[in-house]
Regions:
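Bacterial N-terminal signal peptides that target proteins for export
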Residues: 1-10
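N-terminal signal peptide c-region/cleavage motif recognized by signal peptidases
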Residues: 17-20
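Beta-sheet-dominated interaction scaffolds and their linkers
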Residues: 23-50, 147-165, 200
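Buried hydrophobic-core signal for structured, non-transmembrane domains
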Residues: 42-48, 97-98, 114-119, 166-172
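Short acidic, flexible loop segments centered on an aromatic residue
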Residues: 50-72, 173-191
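Intrinsically disordered, low-complexity Pro/Gly/Ser/Thr-rich segments with frequent PxxP/GP/PP motifs
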Residues: 71-103, 192-219
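Terminal connector regions
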Residues: 102-146, 218-246
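Intrinsically disordered, low-complexity segments enriched in serine, threonine, and glycine
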Residues: 162-246
Length: 246
């Protein structure tokens, strides 16, 4: 059964600045993984910096993007070890993503994308009052193809008017994911509008994603320059508002 991944961008954005995912007593580091074609496994650390024990479950899903939405399906390419763990206060545990079979290969082979879903599970709270918060984290995992390096992300951009709502469309025809962050727009008169501080989201190879922008469509009517961080590098793109086909 497929899972929709609507919360992942928010979680990743919270982690982006520090490189560590905080969750009360539970911390995750690093917050993304990449397996080279020569690697069979890569790992991250789960740490408990709280005063009480933590139980966690770790699963992995194949991550694709269809119809401008993130989609998770059961993974046949990676497995997790260990999938269940208990961490006493002050403990940490290495959790590995292990590749099954060969990496992507062949002419034009692209990265494969996965998500590690880390759930903090309820613990025995007998005798304790208050609400127990149980959290979920989503960590991107990328598997590089064998042979020649995957083609870098190749992005095309558009801002489309849907009523008075502007929608940003980004398509990636390259073989590598694009992580988008810190989006801003500067109009022809030099007025700058911050659109998305922190992480906007990802565009996987061969996929197209769409995001609603908060300003009214008229802000973009005269065209201007879109600036964003793409995989940590500042990119500027001339852009104008277009009407969606009816």
């Amino acid at each position: 059964m497929a899972l929709r991944l609507r919360h992942a961008a928010l979680l990743a954005g919270l982690w982006l600045a520090s490189g560590v995912a905080p969750a009360g007593g539970l911390q995750v580091s690093p917050v993304s993984l990449t397996l080279a074609a020569s690697q069979n496994a890569e790992g991250l650390w789960l740490s408990n910096t709280g005063d009480n024990g933590v139980n966690a479950q770790v699963r992995v899903y194949r991550w694709t993007q269809e119809g401008a939405e993130d989609k998770l399906t059961p993974s046949r390419g990676l497995v997790i070890s260990p999938p269940m763990l208990q961490l006493a206060a002050g403990d940490r545990q290495l959790v590995r993503a292990i590749r099954l079979g060969a990496p992507p290969s062949g002419p034009g082979a692209a990265q494969e994308a996965y998500r590690m879903i880390i759930d903090e599970l309820p613990v025995d709270t007998a005798g304790k009052k208050g609400v127990q918060f149980v959290l979920r984290y989503s960590v991107p995992v990328f598997v590089e193809p064998a042979g020649a390096a995957a083609a870098p992300a190749q992005l095309s951009w558009a801002i489309r008017r849907e009523g008075d709502k502007p929608m940003l469309e980004v398509a990636n025809s390259g073989g590598t994911h694009a992580q988008l962050a810190n989006l801003s727009f500067t109009d022809a008169a030099g007025h700058r509008t911050e659109l998305t501080p922190g992480l906007l989201g990802y565009v996987l190879p061969g996929a197209q994603m769409r995001w609603a922008l908060k300003p009214a469509a008229k802000v973009f009517a005269g065209g201007g320059t879109l600036e964003t961080m793409v995989n940590g590098q500042t990119v500027q793109q001339k852009i104008s508002l277009v009407d969606s086909p009816r």
